[in-house]
């Protein structure tokens, strides 16, 4: 019988074989960290070291959780809980809160905006859209750092928080306090409160802490370089006096420091867990040698990054650096290069333009649309949250009650035709084109399913779409991706243009210390 670890390389296998005690895996980009931790969990379960029902794997996004859960299923592992920090904490709150407080759990707000706006108005602080957004971000930073309004004031001065517009530390502190009062009055909580409340209850109610620790004995945490103080505190409380935890991450890939995340917990992991065994994954299966060489050159100046990547892809095109006179010229010439790549046979979906902030997308949207190049904005509205997609799914479900002899793909085309789909893309109009792209993507998915399973019927297709929606696996339209660097993390394309590599923009200008620049 083949060993479950035979599919791993030597570095991955060494980490996966270490199934007991604290483990820290430093995994560079494209080195197979998800593959390693899923095989480690599977190996621990198969060998009887871990009970799957007492194992909790924590990720940072619902999509990552879905991918990890799916891979464990492919390895024959079931029963392991795979959740985000927030979903794991919320599940515990829903169970324990009514027991200890004899009341319902506060309502979870999908957005802070309205409550922050109310608090800003009460404090006579500017409440325009941009100011509310900046206030909400600053309140979030304070809460993930476990700071009260008074403590925020002191900490913000200490670390020299860079505030936008007319905001001051004093104004933020006052709005923060008023915001907390509004939450309390409305019996509501935000996403940070989910973690803060779980942490507080674990600290103050031993019965809850003991029950959670009895339930979960083995922990795995992905993307540990992006853990915030409140998340690390919650993990520590889940563990108690135990240390059966495996963390994986890369200090060089910390991308959420602006919202309170810090790589210090990964870098200093051994100071918290003295028996920690360290492993490095440096074999990059994602990028060719020229790209890895440039990455290593950039990261060589970062003393916190222990991993020097080694490409397993061999040679490839060199990385090119091009200067432009202005943003308009940059967009125009990148657009021309994209046309040339498409003419050479590279599909639009295999091309991406990345930038630091979302506002940079507009000029590329205009240029590529003018050239007739289909585009897909990533990091904007989620695919399954788009109005036209929701409407399409509603009509597809309605079609489940209609019997007929047509092939599934024909039925899908007929139904989507009733909501605006046509075989040919519209000639003009960005909104019309985006709607058509969404509907045509659903048609493409139907064709893919029919090709895989000629017996597939409409109920099978609707079920597959529901599964994608649940796991946030949005389908990829055949369009050039426009995305911020943050939204692009972990994704791959054949050709990538990084726009706006200019002093003050990358890294963003409000980075003032060495840590912020890193």
Give short role names for the model-derived ranges.
Residues 1-102, 106, 186, 210, ...:
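P-loop NTPase Walker
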Residues 2-7, 43, 229-324, 394:
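Conserved RecA-like helicase ATPase core segment
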Residues 6-17, 21-29, 36, 56-57, ...:
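Conserved helicase NTPase motor core
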Residues 18-19, 99-192, 216, 278-280, ...:
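ATP-hydrolysis module of ASCE/P-loop NTPase motor domains
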Residues 25, 29-37, 41, 274-277, ...:
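Helicase P-loop NTPase motor core
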Residues 49-54, 74-80, 95-108, 118-130, ...:
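Short, polar/flexible loop-turn hinges at active-site or ligand-entry regions and domain interfaces
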Residues 79-92, 373-394:
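Conserved beta-strand -> loop -> alpha-helix junction used to position metal-binding or nucleic-acid-contacting
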Residues 165, 361-373, 385-518:
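Conserved helicase C-terminal RecA-like lobe
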